[in-house]
From Swiss-Prot:
<feature type="glycosylation site" description="N-linked (GlcNAc) asparagine">
    <location>
        <position position="87"/>
    </location>
</feature>
<dbReference type="InterPro" id="IPR033697">
    <property type="entry name" value="Ribonuclease_T2_eukaryotic"/>
</dbReference>
<dbReference type="GO" id="GO:0006401">
    <property type="term" value="P:RNA catabolic process"/>
</dbReference>
<feature type="glycosylation site" description="N-linked (GlcNAc...) asparagine">
    <location>
        <position position="175"/>
    </location>
</feature>
<feature type="binding site">
    <location>
        <begin position="111"/>
        <end position="112"/>
    </location>
    <ligand>
        <name>RNA</name>
    </ligand>
</feature>
<keyword id="KW-0732">Signal</keyword>
<dbReference type="InterPro" id="IPR001568">
    <property type="entry name" value="RNase_T2-like"/>
</dbReference>
<keyword id="KW-0255">Endonuclease</keyword>
<keyword id="KW-1015">Disulfide bond</keyword>
<feature type="glycosylation site" description="N-linked (GlcNAc...) asparagine">
    <location>
        <position position="160"/>
    </location>
</feature>
<dbReference type="Pfam" id="PF00445">
    <property type="entry name" value="Ribonuclease_T2"/>
</dbReference>
<feature type="binding site">
    <location>
        <begin position="115"/>
        <end position="116"/>
    </location>
    <ligand>
        <name>RNA</name>
    </ligand>
</feature>
<feature type="disulfide bond">
    <location>
        <begin position="42"/>
        <end position="49"/>
    </location>
</feature>
<feature type="binding site">
    <location>
        <begin position="98"/>
        <end position="99"/>
    </location>
    <ligand>
        <name>RNA</name>
    </ligand>
</feature>
<feature type="active site" description="Proton acceptor">
    <location>
        <position position="116"/>
    </location>
</feature>
<feature type="binding site">
    <location>
        <position position="36"/>
    </location>
    <ligand>
        <name>RNA</name>
    </ligand>
</feature>
<dbReference type="GO" id="GO:0003723">
    <property type="term" value="F:RNA binding"/>
</dbReference>
Amino acid sequence: MGITGMTYMFTMVLSLIVLIFSASTVGFDYFQFTQQYQPAVCNSNPTPCNDPTDKLFTVHGLWPSNRNGPDPEKCKTTTMNSQKIGNMTAQLEIIWPNVLNRSDHVGFWEREWLKHGTCGYPTIKDDMHYLKTVIKMYITQKQNVSAILSKATIQPNGNNRSLVDIENAIRSGNNNTKPKFKCQKNTRTTTELVEVTLCSNRDLTKFINCPHGPPKGSRYFCPANVKY
């Protein structure tokens, strides 16, 4: 093989290595830890929920995200090995239920893993590490929005609440970093708080201010007062 051929071969091998590395490491800036208020999710959903709801914020998902540009999705085709969930199941069914269909909790976790969790490498190592990380954040690190609001004496009694009061309460349990809100109208006059997102750096080692939420005029924009 001549010098030209060797150069070509070296270039091809190097390109393959770069391609493999790129496929396993997807760019993202930070994580969104999004929790949804169960009654509001069911009220805003076109199809009624199959089962009664709890007045709790429970996990929607943990999502690698970008401040600018699209968020990564479905970075690998690696499906979740649900047989390994084992003794985590009981905790996950409480903190991360499929609110719309409680007979399909595992399917919900599998879809969240495939769409979002597969893009969290190297912070998220694999499917079981994804589930364990969510449990750690919600329970051990006390990133439970319902508990944070309750500590600030903001209870889910169905009244209109100042969004500023809700934000201040969450900041007090979140190192004074800005959360993100998602709301939705369930009647002409009533807008419910549907989701609260807490944001962390890409290593999940500290809270950061969330980038802006839904813009004014969006169907998910939160007004000054919301039902909770």
